[in-house]
Amino acid sequence: MKTNQSRRKFLGNAAVGASVAALTSPLHVEAAMVESNQQARNASQPRQGKPPMSVSSANGLAAVNKAVEVMRGGGDTLDAVIAGVNIVELDPKDNSVGYGGLPNERGDVELDASAMHGPTRRAGAVASIRGVRTPSKVARAVLEHTDHILIVGQGAREFATAHGFEDMNLLTEESRIAWLRWKETLSPVDKWGASPYTPAPASPAGQRRIAAERARPSYTLAENYANGDERRREELLAWADEVARKPPTGTINCLALDAASDISGVTTTSGLAWKIPGRVGDSPLIGCGLYVDNDTGAAGSTGRGEEVIYINGARSVVEYMRRGSSPEQACLDALKLIAARYGNDLEKLKDIDVNFYALNKRGEFAGAAIWSHTVTGRGELRRRQFAAHDGREGRLLESAYLFERKA
C-alpha cells in the first residue's frame, strides 16, 4: 500500500544552518510561512510540569510512573530512571528492549544501554552485551565502579559477571518465532525452509502433502515451533509476519528531574532487529542516544540509531536548549538536521523513524518525531506519542513532528 505523505511544514523560524540552507525552494518557503504562526503558539506555551517528574518514550508510561514514585520516596534521579526502565527491560512483551528483545541475524539477543547522572556529571554504557536482562544496571555499574564510559561485547559480559549479573537466555518464544519467520523467508535460494530435493512420496497422500507445502506462500518452520491453541498460534504467526516485514525500531529512553533540579537519564535497547552481530546504534553512545547536562537539561532518542549518530542527536537537542530553545523546538531543530541530510526529500525520508525526548531544568518537556504517524507492518497508521509524568499524573501525549503522514 502506497502511503500518501503530505508535507507538514517545519514548526519553526529558528532552523539550524544546515536546514536553512536546504529550505530554498518556493514550496519549502511557502510551507514554512504557513507553519510559523503555529510554531509561535507552541513556543509560547511549552508543556511544563512540577518536579519530581519524568519523560519517556511511548513504551515508558509505567517507567515514568515508577520514576516519580522513586523520587517521591527519596531516591536519586538515577535510581528513578533505572527503576523505571527495568520494568520494560524485564517485560517479555516489549520486543525492543531487554528480555524478549528481537535478536540479531544469528538469533542472538545483543543489548545496549547508557546512563548519565547529572549531579556528578558521570556516564556509563555497555554495548553488544548478551545474557543480561537489565543492561541499564550494568551501564550504571560502569558509571559507578570504573573510570571508563563504554564497555562492549565479551568484555561487557565478563564485567557483568564480575558484578553478579546472571547469564540468562534472553530469547522468548515470541522473539524466536519472529526471527525464524524472518530467517526462513529471507531468500528463496538459501538453505532455510523446505528442501527442493524432497524424495518422491511413496503414496498419493504424501504427494498431496508435498504439493500443498510447496503451494504455501511461506515456509513452515515458524508454524512448526509455535505453541498454544489455534487462536494464539494465529495471533503469534500474524505478529511474526508483521515484524519480519517491518522490524520495530524500539528502545526506551527515560529522563527524570527532581525537586532539587537535578537530572539523570538512561537509554536501553535490544537494537535493530536482525542486525549484523556487533552492530551498535545510538543508545549506548553518550551524546547520541542520551545526553544530560545538569545545568541545562537532558535529551534522549529512539528510532533509527544510525541517523541519530550522524548528528549527535541528544547532544544537539541539549545544546539547542542551552542556547534558549524550548524542549520542543530543540527536538524539532535536531530532527531538521536529519531531514537536511536527505535534502528534505520526503521520498527518501519516508522510512526513517527517529524520535527525540527532552526535559529542561524548569520542568519544560517535549517529544518530537520526524513523522506524525508511524506505519505498522500491516500498513496501519499510528500516531506518534511519548510518555510523561508532569508531577500530577503519568499519561501518553502526542509528539510534535516535522512532516505529516496521511493515509
Describe the function of each predicted region.
Residues 1-18:
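N-terminal secretory signal peptides and thylakoid transit peptides that target proteins
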Residues 2, 35-36, 42:
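Intrinsic low-complexity/disordered segments
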Residues 26-38:
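Signal peptide processing junction and immediate N-terminal pro/mature segment
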Residues 41-373, 393-406:
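Proteins synthesized as precursors that undergo proteolytic processing into mature forms
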Residues 376-392:
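Glycine-rich phosphate/cofactor-binding loops in nucleotide/flavin-utilizing enzymes
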